[in-house]
Curated annotation (Swiss-Prot):
<keyword id="KW-0698">rRNA processing</keyword>
<feature type="region of interest" description="Disordered">
    <location>
        <begin position="304"/>
        <end position="352"/>
    </location>
</feature>
<feature type="region of interest" description="Disordered">
    <location>
        <begin position="1"/>
        <end position="207"/>
    </location>
</feature>
<keyword id="KW-0175">Coiled coil</keyword>
<dbReference type="GO" id="GO:0000462">
    <property type="term" value="P:maturation of SSU-rRNA from tricistronic rRNA transcript (SSU-rRNA, 5.8S rRNA, LSU-rRNA)"/>
</dbReference>
<dbReference type="Pfam" id="PF06102">
    <property type="entry name" value="RRP36"/>
</dbReference>
<feature type="compositionally biased region" description="Basic and acidic residues">
    <location>
        <begin position="130"/>
        <end position="155"/>
    </location>
</feature>
<feature type="compositionally biased region" description="Basic and acidic residues">
    <location>
        <begin position="28"/>
        <end position="39"/>
    </location>
</feature>
<protein>
    <recommendedName>
        <fullName>rRNA biogenesis protein rrp36</fullName>
    </recommendedName>
</protein>
<dbReference type="GO" id="GO:0030686">
    <property type="term" value="C:90S preribosome"/>
</dbReference>
<comment type="subunit">
    <text>Associates with 90S and pre-40S pre-ribosomal particles.</text>
</comment>
<dbReference type="GO" id="GO:0005730">
    <property type="term" value="C:nucleolus"/>
</dbReference>
<feature type="compositionally biased region" description="Acidic residues">
    <location>
        <begin position="67"/>
        <end position="86"/>
    </location>
</feature>
<feature type="compositionally biased region" description="Basic and acidic residues">
    <location>
        <begin position="304"/>
        <end position="315"/>
    </location>
</feature>
<keyword id="KW-0687">Ribonucleoprotein</keyword>
<dbReference type="InterPro" id="IPR009292">
    <property type="entry name" value="RRP36"/>
</dbReference>
<feature type="compositionally biased region" description="Acidic residues">
    <location>
        <begin position="16"/>
        <end position="27"/>
    </location>
</feature>
Length: 352
């Protein structure tokens, strides 16, 4: 049991970091030790068989046995006894003791690095895993180099000269940050578009805005009078045409503003009347005017504010407008027939 004592003496503690590293190599070395032990067992069996055959051969011969044969037989017996003792001691050692002894020697790579010198003549054997890793590394490096070359060689170009230019939308974020906000620069303010003015008037309260800017109506009416006077004095045809267009646009603008004001007045009166009826209990729900009813009431209010002469002119103008509209909607034969009735009752025939 001398070998087991020696192995147990050489056992030492290992750090926890090397357990995973030693596991693979320890398994590999255990396999190799098993193979070696198997080979040694087979060799010992072969030697025993040969020794038995030799003894049988010697026994078959009738000649005397010499002193040399006795000495050889004694030496063989001693060797056999020593090998038997070694095998018995090895078989009695537990696997845990063998693993500890193997781990105490350290990993195979570290032992080779410590014992082997760089000037050794024997080349180091490389595992197939290292070869595969080296090949993968080389393939990745080649692929990276090829991709870098392709990126450098490929220049951004348009498909045709008429195609729009392609530009990346990515922009680098500036490293500068505004720590202190600069003072705001005062800007010129137009009261017509000022939000403070529009919040008090404008869309929320059109009536107050109209009262606040009522002086603009006087300016527009005076401007229209000046344009008409200038149109009467000028004699140039081009200037007359330009003044005529300007007078027409100004008068249309004033007329549209007047119509809008009239609509608002009609709506205000209607709402006031409906509220009064609801307050008196004559109605439970208010009645909202339709666009057609609103248009009729606005037209009546417009004619009520006119004098007799203006009213007759406006009615004649409206009658002609409606007649021309109806004539356009009539078919061509009826339209020509109505025109023929004016010429002595003769009807014009359409030539095919």
């Amino acid at each position: 049991m001398a070998i087991s004592d020696l192995l147990n003496r050489r056992v030492r503690a290992l750090p926890e970091e090397d357990e995973e590293i030693y596991s693979e190599e320890s398994a590999f070395e255990e396999k190799s030790d098993d193979r070696r032990s198997g080979e040694s067992d087979s060799d010992s069996d072969d030697l025993d068989d040969e020794a038995l055959e030799e003894t049988d051969d010697n026994s078959e011969h009738d000649g005397p046995v010499g002193l040399e044969d006795d000495e050889d037989s004694e030496d063989g017996e001693d060797n056999d006894n020593g090998e038997d003792d070694v095998q018995a001691s090895l078989s009695s050692i537990s696997f845990g003791a063998l693993a500890k002894a193997q781990a105490s020697l350290g990993p195979k790579g570290k032992r080779n690095a410590k014992t082997a010198k760089p000037t050794e003549e024997s080349p180091q054997t490389t595992s197939p895993l290292d070869d595969i890793r080296a090949r993968i590394r080389e393939a990745r490096e080649q692929k990276r180099q090829e991709s870098g070359k392709s990126k450098d060689s490929a220049k951004p170009a348009r498909t045709s000269k008429h195609a729009p230019m392609v530009q990346s939308s990515k922009r680098a974020v500036s490293r500068k940050r505004t720590v202190v906000e600069p003072p705001s620069v005062p800007k010129s303010r137009d009261p017509r578009f000022d939000p403070t003015v529009l919040s008090h008037g404008g869309r929320h309260n059109a009536e107050s805005a109209r009262k606040a800017y009522s002086f603009l109506d006087d300016y527009r009416s005076s401007e229209l009078k000046e344009l008409k006077a200038k149109f009467a004095k000028t004699k140039n045809a081009e200037e007359k045409e330009a003044l005529k267009r300007e007078i027409r646009s100004t008068s249309d603008r004033l007329r549209a503003m007047e119509n809008r004001r009239r609509e608002e007045e009609v709506l205000a009166e209607h709402k006031k009347r409906e509220k009064q009826l609801i307050r008196e209990g004559k109605k439970s729900n208010p009645y909202f005017l339709k666009k057609s009813d609103l248009k009729k009431q606005v037209m009546l209010k417009k004619y009520e504010n006119m004098n007799s002469k203006e009213r007759t002119k406006a009615l004649e103008r409206r009658r002609k407008k409606i007649a021309s509209k109806e004539r356009k909607e009539m078919p061509m034969e009826r339209r020509l027939g109505s025109e023929g009735n004016d010429d002595g009752g003769r009807k014009r025939r359409r030539m095919a």
